[in-house]
Amino acid sequence: ITMPDNKLAHVNSTPQDKAIKKIFAKLEKPVQTISLYDALMQHRQEYVYYRTDHHWTSKGAYYGYVGICEKLGISHALSEYKKKKFGSFIGTYYGDTNGDKNFRKDELAVYYPVSDKISMKYQNESGKIVNGHVIADSSKYGISNKYLAFLEGDNAYTVITNKNIKDSSS
């Protein structure tokens, strides 16, 4: 999505929009799909993917969220969220280059809802269910682990409870 069209023509890869359509076509009928390709393409000149990592930035995730909300008929403005910056971040691509000093570090910023009614539990590495944070303070992590700010990292099992939601959608 973020690669300029003139460079994309020289990459031996299937265009993302075609790959998404092919995957969606293979899914069974009960599966409902939402493509976020167009939502992200509208913002491709912005910082929607990290330079040093394969994940999208919080701003990119917000645009994806807006794409989902549009399909569901709901909306939440970015102004409804608090923004917190956690400083410099270097991701997977940086490690893949053996720490090439030419890489510009990314900046990790997160947007989170202003609510004390959201809680999270997850299964830690020992298999124990523990309390956690949807957005954790990543200042305690090293520069290459800042992404652990989101849901306390990649866990086998996570449950998020939002007491603000009164229907069965949560």
Where in this protein do the model-derived segments appear?
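Extracellular glycan-modifying ectodomains
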Residues: 1-170
